[in-house]
């Protein structure tokens, strides 16, 4: 296993901390929009970044600013796209079938827009259950990003603080 530090951007416009009006404003203006300016900073500075874009957020980008998708596709050496679900919610409360549906719909939307997608999954809020890890593995996903700080203390202390492989 190699060790590499990467910047990961959890990109979800349906976050409770972002108003719809600010998000829609960020998409306006084509290549001069705030979102394209932000993406261009990474390109200009040759700063690699891993983007995890929620499927519903990607639908907004596709409709209101496809130029942003073009920038990402044109600069695969800068942008790494990872898998996300369609909806950004607390997946801990989902049934197996709805969890799978949400993830599959997100993956389908991401793969339909981006030419190069890593087989790594970023769960909403970095939270996922043991059962959902099993479901993700069955989907063929290679890796999952987890943030121990999002879990209760009794669970958090059981999560190994370094990248690791899980078997079983």
Segments from the language model and where they lie:
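Short secondary-structure boundary/capping segments
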Residues: 22-26, 66-67, 98-100, 135-142
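Metal-dependent polysaccharide deacetylase catalytic core of the NodB/CE4 family, i.e.
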Residues: 52-125
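A short helix-to-beta-strand connector/capping loop
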Residues: 3, 47, 75-80, 167-168
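N-terminal regions that are enriched for targeting/export leaders
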Residues: 1-49
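Alpha-helical scaffolding within the catalytic cores
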Residues: 33-37, 62-76, 153-166
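Active-site-adjacent pocket scaffolds in enzyme catalytic domains
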Residues: 124-168
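Alpha-helical packing segments of well-folded alpha/beta enzyme cores
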Residues: 31-42, 102-110, 132
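Hydrophobic faces of well-ordered beta-strands that scaffold small-molecule active sites
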Residues: 5-9, 49-51, 81-84, 119, ...
